[in-house]
């Protein structure tokens, strides 16, 4: 009875996780740094009068917030890094990405201590080495590693790609792979790398869509910069030509003109979010929403120039 249950247990799905604490701490440190300075810049921008320096403070706050989000994603990816061995595949889990390696495509496993140290191009900080390198005797290799020294690396060479993993118990890891390889695969699998969750949106792989969203954001920044730079020179009470009211002349507080910039920001946010969602179902419609957002920014820039010149 015992001899019959041992093979079954040995072929259960096994998740091997490398040491991740250092990588998460370093990545989290960048998140905290960017978030703190973003909050400080936002506080300056929110409490200051409308002028170009206020625009710069707001821009810095937004950029630092984006940096914090990016590093938070990378820190989460380090925390979630795992090598999952099931019946037919070895799956590398890295954040919102999974790399599936059929076990029957694995040709050999090479301990890192037997090879020269590689210089990884990609994400590189203490406890995080994710990217690619040309490794002597192995070739082009994808790294999903948190290693502190080459001794912690295990190179998995397949018929298509080579991978560098951080495995402390390399003998045990190799035994698990070899046990499954000896039995042969039950179901056919294709070696692939796939995004999951929010990273699976087609938007992230569409350079045209990313470019359209980026240009819209840049035009929105130009709109804010012009409005905030021109605002201090206006008198407190001005003639308002925006919005147009069929030739009716209005007078009011100059703060009314700030609504042009706020409208541009709202249009950018709405069109970008809806564009990304729609793009997942219909690429052309999603692209049109992002492009139209940029066109509306141009219309608002022209409206702002005319409104300020007439005020």
Label each region the model flagged.
Residues 87-96, 117-128, 265-279:
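Alpha-helical membrane-embedding segments
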């Amino acid at each position: 009875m015992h001899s019959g249950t041992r093979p079954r247990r040995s072929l259960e799905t096994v998740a091997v996780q490398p040491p991740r604490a250092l990588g998460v701490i370093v990545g989290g440190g960048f998140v905290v740094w960017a978030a703190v300075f973003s909050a400080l810049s936002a506080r300056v921008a929110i409490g200051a009068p409308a002028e170009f320096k206020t625009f710069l403070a707001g821009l810095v706050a937004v950029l630092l917030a984006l940096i914090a989000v990016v590093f938070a994603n990378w820190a989460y990816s380090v925390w979630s890094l795992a090598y999952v061995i099931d019946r037919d595949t070895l799956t590398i889990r890295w954040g919102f990405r999974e790399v599936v390696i059929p076990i029957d495509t694995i040709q050999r496993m090479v301990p890192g201590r037997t090879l020269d140290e590689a210089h990884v191009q990609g994400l590189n900080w203490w406890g995080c080495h994710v990217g690619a390198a040309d490794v002597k005797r192995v070739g082009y290799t994808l790294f999903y590693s948190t290693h502190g020294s080459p001794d912690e690396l295990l190179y998995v060479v397949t018929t298509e790609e080579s991978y560098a993993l951080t495995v402390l118990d390399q003998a045990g890891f190799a035994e698990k792979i070899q046990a499954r390889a000896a039995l042969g695969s039950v179901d056919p699998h294709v070696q692939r790398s796939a995004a999951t969750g929010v990273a699976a949106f087609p938007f992230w792989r569409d350079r045209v869509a990313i470019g359209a969203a980026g240009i819209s954001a840049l035009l929105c920044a130009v709109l804010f910069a012009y409005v905030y730079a021109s605002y201090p020179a206006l008198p407190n009470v001005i003639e308002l030509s925006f919005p147009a009211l069929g030739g009716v002349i209005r007078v009011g507080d100059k703060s009314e003109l700030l609504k042009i910039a706020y409208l541009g920001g709202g249009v950018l946010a709405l069109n970008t979010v809806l564009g990304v969602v729609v793009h997942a179902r219909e690429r052309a419609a999603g692209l049109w929403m992002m492009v139209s957002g940029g066109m509306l920014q141009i219309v608002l820039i022209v409206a702002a120039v005319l409104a300020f010149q007439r005020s």
